[in-house]
Curated annotation (Swiss-Prot):
Function as written in the Swiss-Prot or TrEMBL entry: Membrane-anchoring subunit of succinate dehydrogenase (SDH) that is involved in complex II of the mitochondrial electron transport chain and is responsible for transferring electrons from succinate to ubiquinone (coenzyme Q).
Keyword terms, alphabetized: Electron transport, Heme, Iron, Membrane, Metal-binding, Mitochondrion, Mitochondrion inner membrane, Transit peptide, Transmembrane, Transmembrane helix, Transport, Tricarboxylic acid cycle
Organism: Dictyostelium discoideum (Social amoeba)
GO BP of this protein: mitochondrial electron transport, succinate to ubiquinone; tricarboxylic acid cycle
A single Gene Ontology CC term: respiratory chain complex II (succinate dehydrogenase)
Protein name according to UniProt: Succinate dehydrogenase cytochrome b560 subunit, mitochondrial
Textual note on the cofactor: The heme b is bound between the two transmembrane cytochrome b560 subunits.
Amino acid sequence: MFGRTLNTFTSRNAPLVRNFDKFIVNNTLTSKNIYLSQTNTTNTPLSYSTQAKKPFTITEKRIDELKTPYQPTSPHLTIYKFPLPAVMSIMHRATGICLALGITGLAGVTLFAPHDAIHYIQLLHTQYPALVYPAKFAVALPLTYHFCTGVRHIIWDETVKGLSISQIESSGKVLLAVVAVLSTIFTFVSFK
């Protein structure tokens, strides 16, 4: 038994297949009878594969035909409820990007504009006095938020305390309250 090769096993199994008279190959396009006993006279194994008369085709549809109206793509971001630490982490990055773009814009104004930045701030005070406080709040909020969350991360890195999920969520709520108070103070305080 151990001295036989794979060819011995396949040639011994071939006569078992010859006992079948015919078999039917079915697919969606054709149904035909294949006679096995007429073609194979040697001891080689029989091949069971056949070719259909017509090849199978793939039906193509445009992407707008596949969409069902009024259904969002899956998975959609609106079905997820992000936890507070995840939202605060995303907002920390977003405020960092906004502050970097704002400082770059301010540097561009001071370098390439015909007047300095103080002239444009005074122009805002005289021409659009209703926009002074919203503009100050738009600067104070990302600045205080990014600063406070950065301090919280430094405390985490240095002390390795307060890293459980409940402590992160509670410190996040306290931090949001501190940011709201500080940004309101910076909005209404005049620095002259």
